[in-house]
Amino acid sequence: MAKNRFNQHWLHDHINDPYVKMAQREGYRARAAYKLKEIDEQDKLIRPGQVIVDLGATPGSWSQYARNKLAQGKKRDAEREGGIDGTIVALDILPMEPIADVHFLQGDFREDDVLHQLEEVLEGRAVDLVISDMAPNLSGVASADAARIEHLCDLALEFAQNHLKPDGALLVKCFHGSGYSQIVEKFKQQFKVVAPRKPKASRDKSSETFILGRQLKHPR
């Protein structure tokens, strides 16, 4: 019974969520698009001509937002017109419905085959921005969840170190908890500028937050 009440409460909140309604109205696949939008508007992350990589992209709302930002013209229906000023590569182990002008690679970005496909798309170009909305399946066991979250952040950090331009940026999702300070410290070891971000689109009850790193200390 308690589980049913929780599910009913979540469904009620979800249906009445203004960001869910906005996403449905504006054609985004998830309300998460507005988290990236708010951070982008604050930090001016996405600019014309950039190479952007979206890790853990499915269902694709972050790639949609980035695509719309780089689209020719300023119309919300630009996706139907085609053409962007820049390159977006979305990666996920899960399938994703196509998005116009977005290169989607399904697979683990640590594997050589996927990295080879990525290199073919990039054509030798370094990446301006890596965005990651990856999140593990949380178990409710604090220590185990902290380790899973930190692991995903480590993967994003390693990817960024290998692919970012010296003045590039990495934005990742994490959660406040026992491992949060360690993640921030790892960012500080890798980036000259590190800042936490908590967009209004994040649910009030969620411990979700985002960390932004800019300008690699030790570019490759």
Swiss-Prot record:
- GO MF terms on file? rRNA (uridine-2'-O-)-methyltransferase activity
The cross-references to SUPFAM superfamilies, in alphabetical order and at most eight, read:
S-adenosyl-L-methionine-dependent methyltransferases (SSF53335)
Active-site positions on this chain = 173
Top-level taxon = Bacteria
Location(s), subcellular: Cytoplasm
Entry-linked Pfam families: FtsJ
Task: List the catalysed reactions.
Answer: uridine(2552) in 23S rRNA + S-adenosyl-L-methionine = 2'-O-methyluridine(2552) in 23S rRNA + S-adenosyl-L-homocysteine + H(+)
What organism, scientifically named, is this protein from?
Burkholderia cenocepacia (strain HI2424)
GO CC terms of this entry: cytoplasm
Q: InterPro entries recorded for this chain?
A: RNA_methyltr_RlmE, RNA_MeTrfase_FtsJ_dom, rRNA-MeTfrase_E, SAM-dependent_MTases_sf
Provide the protein name: Ribosomal RNA large subunit methyltransferase E
Q: Which Gene3D superfamilies match?
A: Vaccinia Virus protein VP39 (3.40.50.150)
**What are the binding positions for S-adenosyl-L-methionine in this chain?**
60, 62, 92, 108, 133
Broad enzyme group: transferase
Query: What is the purpose of this protein?
Result: Specifically methylates the uridine in position 2552 of 23S rRNA at the 2'-O position of the ribose in the fully assembled 50S ribosomal subunit.
